[in-house]
Swiss-Prot record:
Pfam families: adh_short. This is 17-beta-hydroxysteroid dehydrogenase type 1. It is an enzyme of class 1 (oxidoreductase). It comes from the Eukaryota. NADP(+) binds at residues 10-38, 66, 160. PROSITE patterns: ADH_SHORT. Keywords: Cytoplasm, Lipid biosynthesis, Lipid metabolism, NAD, NADP, Oxidoreductase, Phosphoprotein, Steroid biosynthesis. The gene is Hsd17b1. One of its GO terms (molecular function) is NADP+ binding.
Length: 344
């Protein structure tokens, strides 16, 4: 039986590297993996991981592929000796983090070029053959940042929102050609991704006003805490295998349930008010409480202990969602049933 030919982008580290080695070392020996990197000088960790995991000879080949360059994509495609790719994994990605006005436009363009146009270049190269053969799987490394807006991730979220629309649109069409598209929705993962943020965290911060810089510094402390609780890449790679092996793969697979209540809020209140208020609460309520305490002020409608903050949800927001977020209906005088408390 012919092996399943898998081509993966962005394999110098993180999810791409772990997935390539996981498939190439699989005991079934049913995968032939083409692990691609933008620069072959960065292949050292991948080679070491393959050696450590005992990848059999011929199970893993490393190719140079820069998703920003159509000629590079075509050259890598020509190196696939089987003449086909059964599973295409679009994993290469780039991040940008900090106040929007602090970013250089070339850094913004680089993120969009890799995350959006890079994925499109790969699809344009490999989809035609999959459609001709009436067989193929496309897996795209996505992010909760493509399902909900996150402060100080505006450009990154824009790129990931674009991937959601791209893949969802293709998922409607491609089953007619025997091809399936799946998004692997990741939260924070322990990879080098966060060390490679374009321009570093915040970029040229002096371009932002003092209040925005203050808010960013506060947000960054919570962000660092979130990264300390990130998943290991090995956990996430198993989701890719699930999507590969499913007879009828889903459009989305989630590596964590942590953000699902917030994501559901966006669909259950199409106005967006519930989600915006909830994320504001999540990101900045501690700061507001601290500043109120420093000023000797009391948050209106909240007890002197200031141990909880109030957020008002529109009537269309389902109470179950609030409950999943750890909120309870407020019984305080003057508050209606659309108000909930969350301990902070």
């Amino acid at each position: 039986m012919d092996p399943t030919v898998v081509l993966i982008t962005g394999c110098s580290s993180g999810i791409g590297m772990h997935l390539a080695v996981r498939l190439a070392s699989d005991r079934s020996q049913s995968f032939k993996v083409y692990a691609t990197l933008r620069d072959l000088k960065a292949q050292g960790p991948l080679l070491e991981a393959a050696r450590t995991q005992g990848c059999p000879p011929g199970s893993l080949e490393i190719l140079e592929l820069d998703v920003r360059d159509s000629k590079s994509v075509a050259a890598a495609q020509a190196c696939v000796t089987e003449g086909r790719v059964d599973v295409l994994v679009c994993n290469a990605g780039r991040g940008l983090f900090g106040p929007l006005e602090a970013h250089e436009l070339n850094a913004v363009g680089a993120v969009l070029d890799v995350n959006v146009l890079g994925t499109i270049r790969m699809l344009q190269a490999f989809l035609p053959d999959m459609k001709r053969r009436h067989s193929g799987r496309v897996l795209v490394t996505a992010s909760v940042g493509g399902l909900m807006g996150l402060p100080f991730h505006e450009v990154y979220c824009a790129s990931k929102f674009a991937l959601e629309g791209l893949c969802e649109s293709l998922a409607i069409l491609l089953p007619l050609f025997g091809v399936h598209v799946s998004l692997i929705e990741c939260g924070a993962v322990h990879t080098a991704f966060y060390e490679k943020l374009v321009g570093g965290p915040g970029g040229a911060l002096e371009r932002a006003d003092a209040q925005t810089r203050h808010l960013f510094a506060h947000y960054l402390r919570g962000y660092e805490q979130a990264l300390s609780e990130a998943q290991d890449p090995e956990e996430v790679t198993e989701l890719f295998l699930t999507a590969m092996r499913a007879p009828q793969p889903a459009l989305r697979y989630f590596s964590t349930n942590r953000f699902l209540p917030l994501a559901r809020m966006r669909t259950e209140d199409p106005s967006g008010s519930s989600y915006v208020a909830a994320m504001h609460q999540e990101a900045f309520s501690n700061l507001q409480t601290q500043e109120n305490a420093k000023a000797g002020a009391q948050v209106p409608g909240v007890s002197d202990t200031a141990s909880s903050a109030l957020i008002c949800l529109p009537e269309c927001a389902i109470p179950r969602v609030a409950s999943e977020l750890g909120w309870s209906a407020s019984d305080k005088p003057g508050q209606d049933n659309s108000c909930y408390q969350q301990k902070i």
